[in-house]
């Protein structure tokens, strides 16, 4: 009898992810392990935490699977990978079958380097936090500049 090595088992555990992708509908029940993906416009493929019209929903079995696919799609979206799948002349969109196929291909590639991928995702999460913090600080600086100018402006009441 053939026994699998621990490395083979962990690799297979990561490639076993198989989320369900479908067109978002308000009528469908939501789960704790789902996120949404824009499917129309130049931001097609962008993962979102909250639903919106013109989106797909990715339904996962657990939090690990959700994180895996959310950040995979985030990376593909940032790299403009989905632009090659866009169809339509006025409002470009992605067909769900093409989307599923490409996501499956990319998930398989990434799962072959699971540890390196996980490290990259952790670094991206930190960078996202820093970016939000910097944007918040820039908004505060903008408000302070306005306040400094308003001190010198005569107001009509």
Predicted regions: what they are:
Residues 69, 100-150:
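Amphipathic alpha-helical segments
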């Amino acid at each position: 009898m053939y026994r699998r090595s621990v490395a083979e088992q962990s690799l297979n555990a990561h490639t076993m992810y198989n989320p369900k992708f479908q067109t978002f509908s308000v009528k469908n029940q939501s789960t704790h392990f789902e996120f949404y993906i824009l499917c129309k416009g130049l931001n097609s493929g962008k993962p979102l935490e909250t639903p919106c019209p013109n989106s797909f929903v990715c339904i996962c079995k657990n939090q690990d699977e959700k994180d895996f696919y959310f950040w995979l799609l985030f990376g593909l979206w940032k790299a403009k990978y989905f632009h090659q799948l866009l169809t339509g002349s006025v409002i470009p969109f992605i067909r769900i079958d093409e989307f599923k196929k490409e996501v499956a291909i990319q998930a398989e590639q990434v799962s072959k380097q699971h540890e390196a991928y996980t490290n990259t995702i952790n670094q991206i999460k930190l960078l996202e936090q820093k970016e939000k913090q910097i944007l918040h600080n820039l908004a505060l600086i903008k408000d302070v500049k306005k306040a400094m100018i308003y001190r010198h402006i005569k107001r009509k009441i």
